[in-house]
Amino acid sequence: MGFQIAIDGPAASGKSTVARLLAEKLGFDHLNTGATYRSVAVYLHERGFSPFSAEKEIENALKDLKIDYVNGRVYINGEDYTEKIQSPEAGVLASNFARLEVVRRHLVRIQREICDDKNIVVEGRDIGTVVLPNAHLKIFLTASLEARVERKLKEYQKRGLKVTKEEVERELISRDEQDSKRNVAPLKPAEDAVIIDTTSMSVEEVLDRILKLVRERMNT
């Protein structure tokens, strides 16, 4: 079994940036589980499904689904979905479909297969509690809503997306509510997770804190 690091937290808490850079520094693999949820949500939406579709129909649609996560890009049945999942709409779709047990069950199995026997940094919303409950190190990143809105707004603007600060705030509030109140695998820190508030921390400071924890765990 490899050394597994779980990084959870709400949208725009810094998970993706920290997880990617941490994996690079350690020479570990990296898995963004949110990208797998967004890809599957867009895939299902493209085929006319909604979160209110019959569970059996969704299950049949997922049965032969093959997901590959290679160098930060997500492929479904060989088709690159990476660009399709960058919009705010894809994030909302992911939160809606992620409430369905049939979707989570299917993706958790795939995510565990990807992580099996690897030194890996995995980011998401239920990694430490559901996907990798035995991870060697569990981190839960959090930040104020104001800080997260600013980060998400900059991210969208960098991609050339025209969104207002108010729209981003509404999106994050909605996603927070859906993620924390869903019946299946709600967003919450694992009991043994280290909680880090990144509101006033730089990326480098967060990385240094986690790297110190990694070294401590590896030496025990």
Curated annotation (Swiss-Prot):
The keyword Cell inner membrane is assigned to this record: no
Residues at which ATP binds: 9-17
InterPro entries cross-referenced by the UniProt entry: Cytidylate_kin, Cytidylate_kinase_dom, P-loop_NTPase
SUPFAM superfamilies, per the entry: P-loop containing nucleoside triphosphate hydrolases
GO biological process, one term: nucleobase-containing small molecule interconversion
Keyword Metal-binding among UniProt keywords: no
Location in the cell: Cytoplasm
A single cellular component GO annotation: cytosol
One Pfam family, short name: Cytidylate_kin
One MF term in the entry's GO annotations: dCMP kinase activity
Chemical reaction(s) catalysed: CMP + ATP = CDP + ADP; dCMP + ATP = dCDP + ADP
Keyword set, alphabetical order: ATP-binding, Cytoplasm, Kinase, Nucleotide-binding, Transferase
EC number(s) given by UniProt: 2.7.4.25
PANTHER family, per the entry: CYTIDYLATE KINASE, CYTIDYLATE KINASE/PANTOATE-BETA-ALANINE LIGASE
Family membership: Belongs to the cytidylate kinase family. Type 1 subfamily.
Protein name, entry field: Cytidylate kinase
